[in-house]
UniProtKB/Swiss-Prot annotation:
Function in brief: Acts as a component of the MCM2-7 complex (MCM complex) which is the replicative helicase essential for 'once per cell cycle' DNA replication initiation and elongation in eukaryotic cells. Core component of CDC45-MCM-GINS (CMG) helicase, the molecular machine that unwinds template DNA during replication, and around which the replisome is built.
Protein name per the record: DNA replication licensing factor MCM5
Modified positions (N-acetylserine) in chain numbering: S2
Coiled coil location: none
UniProt keyword annotations, A-Z: Acetylation, ATP-binding, Cell cycle, Chromosome, Cytoplasm, DNA replication, DNA-binding, Helicase, Hydrolase, Nucleotide-binding, Nucleus, Phosphoprotein
Organism, as annotated: Bos taurus
Residues the record lists as binding ADP: R371
Alphabetical GO biological process terms: DNA replication initiation; double-strand break repair via break-induced replication
GO cellular component, as recorded: CMG complex; cytosol; MCM complex; nucleus
Motif Arginine finger boundaries: 512-515
Family according to the record: Belongs to the MCM family.
Modified positions (Phosphoserine) in chain numbering: S605
PROSITE patterns from the UniProt entry: MCM_1 (PS00847), MCM_2 (PS50051)
Single GO MF annotation: helicase activity
Amino acid sequence: MSGFDDPGIFYSDSFGGDNAADEGQARKSQLQRRFKEFLRQYRVGTDRTGFTFKYRDELKRHYNLGEYWIEVEMEDLASFDEELADYLYKQPAEHLQLLEEAAKEVADEVTRPRPAGDEVLQDIQVMLKSDASPSSIRSLKSDTMSHLVKIPGIVIAASGVRAKATRISIQCRSCHSTLTNIAMRPGLDGYALPRKCNTDQAGRPKCPLDPYFIMPDKCKCVDFQTLKLQELPDAVPHGEMPRHMQLYCDRYLCDKVVPGNRVTIMGIYSIKKFGLTSNRGRDRVGVGIRSAYIRVLGIQVDTDGSGRTFAGAMTPQEEEEFRRLAALPNIYELISKSIAPSIFGGTDMKKAIACLLFGGSRKRLPDGLTRRGDINLLMLGDPGTAKSQLLKFVEKCSPIGVYTSGKGSSAAGLTASVMRDPSSRNFIMEGGAMVLADGGVVCIDEFDKMREDDRVAIHEAMEQQTISIAKAGITTTLNSRCSVLAAANSVFGRWDETKGEDNIDFMPTILSRFDMIFIVKDEHNEERDVMLAKHVITLHVSALTQAQAVEGEIDLAKLKKFIAYCRAKCGPRLSAEAAEKLKNRYIIMRSGARQHERDSDRRSSIPITVRQLEAIVRIAEALSKMKLQPFATEADVEEALRLFQVSTLDAALSGTLSGVEGFTSQEDQELLSRIEKQLKRRFAIGSQVSEHSIIQDFTKQKYPEHAIHKVLQLMLRRGEIQHRMQRKVLYRLK
């Protein structure tokens, strides 16, 4: 090791050093010329039909519009010069700079002479696009570092647009010497200022350590933005958390996406410093550790909220197959049979879910307002009736599906939350479940277990299909164009026929936003029980055998693509005859509901309003969309009315108080009033008493037991009394 300390002679191989540098520069110049040749000479079309110079014309058009960018397809570059495309794929950071310089030279040639005031040539940003199959975030390992990658995902957070210096000038505080035009590396890498000033000034003392500072007014900057990308839900293995990746966008790629967008990213898999320090900055560990991010070179937004996840990736053969499928006369029954085939019964409910998956047509009115096309559905009733299983199936079947449970969902988790960005300390917004499901379906299980405050938060998302946020200085509106499929139990766990509408513990404001409300009862029917038991046992016995396609069913992958195709290609409207029929039936429906309210002397908790008329329109449009028809016919309206009849109308009339359990007469009303007054006399405010003893005492006085239950339920709903000690004791509040 003594040779390293020898101050005598220093040997170096100086031969060929300059030549090597010259060769590197010559290679870069040659590659730049080839890139320039590609941009100038690449053409589309044939000599017979006429051809155009694709990138040359695009550069000229964009430059004249003041848009200093161009999108290059990797397939075009590979067909022109495969070696160049290979260089760009394996060493994108180095060769992209040459491509941008070449684009700037071509832009200079095609835009001369430029108008007065615009003589200075602007830099051109090159964005990349490719038809190659994307890889997942999980597949990005160290061997793909600094390579070009293409990954899909959902944008869940976006920072504000900030400035980053591309060229800086620094000045010494002591001797005021300056170093100008220092190039900065693109991406999230910083720049380490020189520790010493190397200016030779005879007769002056040496400059101190760390003398340089940046001169902000002499720096050249570009816009940049950081995004947070999350794995697609269907790409996450069971039982694992979705992974995230930080994205760096600059110049014209800023503000191209918002949280909730499904995107495919083309970029360079890069690393940045990942300093691990203790609280006071001492004991640095992990010096060699780097955290990964992607420097974005191209963004493709996969969906515009219409569920077009698969529509662009379909072959002509698939499209032809789907058109033949839609032309089948029994397509409606075929689709409803394919909805959760392992679940027995519930035919009408499956047909309603089929309508929800296809959806109606979103309409934009001349005054700028919109009418939603998505259908919302509520399943309400007994436990053990496969409600959650249906929700799980719809999540898998929908082109975009998000499943959440009511108890574990907050208002912010469903809509959007505002968080502080750890790097910039600014507030940023992260979209919740209803924003991430834009263009698909949100499945909310245990809807009745949600807190009322959280349930109110989705009112706007269900009807207006937007989420308005005004928090921490951020005021904005996010899109949530999605259907809501909710499942809930009744107030008493099981549906109690004697309680009527008291089984439903939802406000009319939320119930009116559901297009269809199904009451699912576990009825005791021996014949049905035999068939159900046989079906369930068959499922358990044949669960491990190889899956075989059942005749008359569409398999899940094909159904998912068919739904996406229909949603993308078809937007039907009501025909004139169907509209007239619907108008007449709606008037009859309203009068029937009004008569029922008059007879029962109370307002129904499930109202029949204009929203329900629009619901029937949407159901009819969905039925027409399954057949890829431009207009909904009278038959579609008839089926939509039937579905509405067996769901919402039956639910609205389920609380009928006529017959044995009824209180429709004046005598019954007086009986209720008498029981309530006597109950309040012996039950002081602030006291508590056993519910069982009250019922026993009043029964001894010859009052009917169902009437006593009715009074207690009314007082509970009005908030005058409340249950305590596992619903055994009643406590009077007012």
